[in-house]
């Protein structure tokens, strides 16, 4: 299986530019440590769907050990966090976990992740700041 190499955001400036300059697609950023098991699993999933979602989403990786600028602002305390942005606006999604700011658990199904990204993108285009996930992850609640 050929996987797409996802672009790395190596500085805070690169993260800002990715969020600010994309005007048509959802910006998806996986924050975490590249050698963390959860990150590796999620990176594989994200790289496997990148080509399928390229028309409405762009996916980036950001190592929080290299870029610590956003740790406090986005509360990046989990080993792996996926966040969503559209038109320079942080998009929130209710996954049923109590934390609408970020996805901080592993989604292990490609179609589920595509559906989540598409739902957030459709909500963002309608100027909704918070959308409800098509799947309930209450059982994956992370403290």
UniProtKB/Swiss-Prot annotation:
Keywords: Acetylation, mRNA processing, mRNA splicing, Nucleus. GO terms for biological process: mRNA splicing, via spliceosome. GO terms for cellular component: nucleus; spliceosomal complex; U4/U6 x U5 tri-snRNP complex; U5 snRNP. Its main location: nucleus. It is found in: Nucleus. The modification N-acetylalanine is found at residue 2. Belongs to the DIM1 family. This is Spliceosomal protein DIB1. It comes from Saccharomyces cerevisiae (strain ATCC 204508 / S288c).
């Amino acid at each position: 299986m050929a996987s797409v190499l996802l672009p790395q955001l190596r500085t805070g400036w690169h993260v800002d530019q990715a969020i600010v300059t994309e005007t048509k697609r959802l910006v998806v950023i996986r924050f975490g440590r590249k050698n963390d098991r959860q990150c590796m699993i999620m990176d594989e999933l994200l790289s496997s769907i990148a080509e399928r979602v390229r028309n409405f989403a762009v996916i980036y990786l950001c190592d929080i050990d290299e870029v610590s600028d956003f740790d406090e602002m986005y509360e990046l305390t989990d080993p792996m966090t996926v966040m969503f942005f559209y038109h320079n606006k942080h998009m929130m999604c209710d996954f049923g976990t109590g934390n609408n700011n970020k996805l901080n658990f592993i989604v292990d199904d490609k179609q589920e992740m595509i559906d989540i990204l598409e739902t957030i993108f459709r909500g963002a285009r309608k100027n909704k700041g918070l959308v409800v996930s098509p799947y309930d992850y209450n059982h994956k609640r992370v403290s």
